């Protein structure tokens, strides 16, 4: 076949494909192209924390915006970050047989697997946010919207080592749900990065019930004791925005002043912005929780109405520091970042 003929065939193939695509689009129901095109879809959405939770509120605001934009009927589920409660609520959600469920991945693959299997049998579309469940999605489908836990944790550890001016032999404290296979991967990654740089890391395990996230003041005695027993600690890492936003309280309870210790962690919030402003907080990793609310609902609507594949989006967005926090400050105060 000559080059000219090949070009002619290729051009004909492309034109045929374009014609077929246009024909396919023209057959979509009108509501798929208009506002509120997802109005006939019922979704159960897991917010994660309690109502008013610093992080969960941003997730919730993203989900509410998607609901307003697209029109589905959404039931919002609040779990106080309690993984056992999440599993029970997921069991109840599957029994209702909605069109789709957007589930927090905190309980992990093993706990979610049988319920994901039942959802698959019942034709319920699934999305997961904030914590990935790769074995579940490999077995029964579904997408994931959120940061990659270990990757983000390691990146934070490396950045903290650099910005805090740490060196081999220095001592740091890292708080986290280390025993949770899925959710704890992030903080384990931070610990690994610091240890590989030669830092001595004291690990403080947060309760599996998630109560420190629901009420950060409950951690005051543990953090205070750790700082008093280790007066040479140079840095402290926190597992989420709720605790990072409470840093002034922890430091003052231990008799420390702003800037005495390099405090770092994850997420943004109005409290964290104030922490930066007051010199209490030095570093946080942003994971754009608004997207973790908006995109799972968008993807479920696309799956149910348009037959599209589930979304997989890494929402890890880099770091916020004293040098750049003002860029996100106003949006953080509005619970949008």
Regions found by a protein language model. Give the residues of each.
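N-terminal export leaders
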Residues: 6-14
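Helix N-cap / beta->alpha transition motif
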Residues: 5-6, 321
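Basic/polar N-terminal segments that are highly enriched at the extreme N-terminus
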Residues: 1-5, 28-34
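Bacterial N-terminal signal peptides
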Residues: 13-26
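A residue-level marker of the well-folded mature domains of exported/periplasmic proteins
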Residues: 31-337
């Amino acid at each position: 076949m000559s080059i000219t003929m090949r070009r002619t065939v290729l051009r004909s193939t492309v034109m045929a494909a374009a014609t077929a695509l246009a024909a396919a689009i023209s057959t979509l129901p009108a509501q798929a192209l208009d506002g509120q095109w997802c109005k006939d879809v019922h979704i159960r959405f897991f917010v994660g924390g309690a109502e008013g939770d610093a992080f969960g509120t941003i997730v919730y605001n993203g989900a509410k915006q998607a609901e307003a934009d697209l029109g589905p009927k959404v039931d919002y589920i609040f779990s106080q970050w309690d993984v056992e409660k999440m599993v029970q609520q997921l069991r109840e959600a599957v029994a209702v047989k909605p069109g789709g469920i957007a589930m927090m991945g905190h309980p992990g693959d093993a706990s979610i697997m049988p319920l994901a299997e039942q959802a698959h049998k019942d034709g319920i579309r699934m999305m997961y946010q904030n914590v990935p469940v790769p074995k579940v999605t490999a077995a029964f489908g579904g997408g994931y919207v959120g940061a990659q836990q270990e990757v983000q944790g390691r990146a934070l550890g490396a950045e903290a080592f650099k910005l805090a001016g740490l060196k081999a032999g220095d001592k740091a404290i890292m708080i986290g749900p280390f025993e949770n296979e899925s959710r704890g991967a992030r903080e384990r990654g931070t610990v690994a990065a610091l240890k590989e740089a030669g830092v001595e890391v004291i690990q403080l395990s947060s309760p599996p019930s998630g109560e420190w996230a629901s009420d950060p003041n409950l951690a005051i005695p543990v953090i205070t004791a750790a700082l008093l027993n280790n007066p040479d600690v140079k840095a402290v890492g926190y597992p989420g925005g709720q605790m990072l936003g409470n840093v002034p309280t922890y430091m003052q309870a231990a008799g420390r002043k702003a800037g005495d210790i390099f405090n770092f962690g994850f997420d943004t919030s109005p409290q964290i912005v104030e922490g930066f402003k007051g010199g209490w907080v030095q570093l946080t990793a942003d994971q754009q929780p608004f997207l973790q609310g908006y995109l799972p609902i968008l993807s479920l609507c696309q799956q149910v109405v348009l037959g599209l594949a589930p979304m997989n989006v890494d929402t890890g967005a880099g770091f916020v520091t004293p040098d750049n926090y003002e860029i996100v400050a106003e949006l953080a105060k509005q619970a949008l970042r």
